[in-house]
């Protein structure tokens, strides 16, 4: 046995940990670029809460609130330009995966020159970035736990990760208390993404003992708590009786949030595989929500790959009360149904005419994901799998 495990991230997990943001930020300077989406952090009051703590500690700040879902390379460059012009010492991200990923690009390009796409495609490298502090407000992408920042080039539609240790957050403030403002459909999407991260890391070619232990634990948490939590949040949004009592709700939020962070951590080392490799072209082309795309793709992907490692896929299936790896795809479809997610690409606006572009783009942005998949897969196989999703 031989492996390496290195993940220099400071996870600060707990209820109301966000109130300590100034203490965590103080070692990194006296002025922060705060990166958010356009409205949600302000509407929830979290932005004002963070700013109040920074003000009390005499830490200056400037706001960049132009990040949308599926963040663009151009947006990251705009944020980096603002960080430079305002002489910011650090970046603080408040939001979901899109905000955290874009903040990583901002922190990186604030101290590096040239075309960000050169770094994304490894034509250039750097291990420098502004210090980054993240406050995730969704429990799905796990961006708080790794050195990946997924960005889309608006000119080409290429959706691919900027990857380096410099953009691993210096501090990740993982606070279950700030997750409660998520609408049900967002929780469903990000929660399924978290599940996919752990499944793919657990079954990847580069899986190893540490990632196996973490991912296995995270899947057990999600198998137990994700659907009940979603049903509770949905019931509350619809004015219906609560599904969970207060004690159960606290445990569910903690468990799903922790599993999400673990998912981000394990993919930093063990990577993702076929489903993510096929989804990034889809959300690069149509700007669909990542977790929604995975809900269509992951069941098909595991049905293709399970025979290459029946022991691990079988262990996963049994976590969902199914018999062996051959049943994992069906287990995931039941979860997709319970989360009210989409089941085919047609519903997401795709036609079969899109398949050639999707297949070609897999080999532009996701060759590493394909190589990390335990089953051998060809271009014709990928084309056939896309066809199954209509």
Residues covered by each model-derived region:
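ATP/NTP phosphate-donor binding region
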Residues: 1-90, 345
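Short glycine/serine/threonine-rich phosphate/pyrophosphate-binding segments
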Residues: 18-21, 43-46, 73-74, 98-104, ...
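Glycine/threonine-rich beta-strand-loop-alpha-helix active-site module
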Residues: 74-177
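Glycine-rich phosphate/pyrophosphate-binding beta-alpha loops
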Residues: 140, 261-294, 368-369
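Carboxylate- and glycine-rich phosphate/diphosphate-binding segment that chelates Mg2+/Mn2+
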Residues: 148-270
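Active-site pocket-lining segment
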Residues: 287-346
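C-terminal charged capping/lid subdomain of soluble metabolic enzymes
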Residues: 323-390
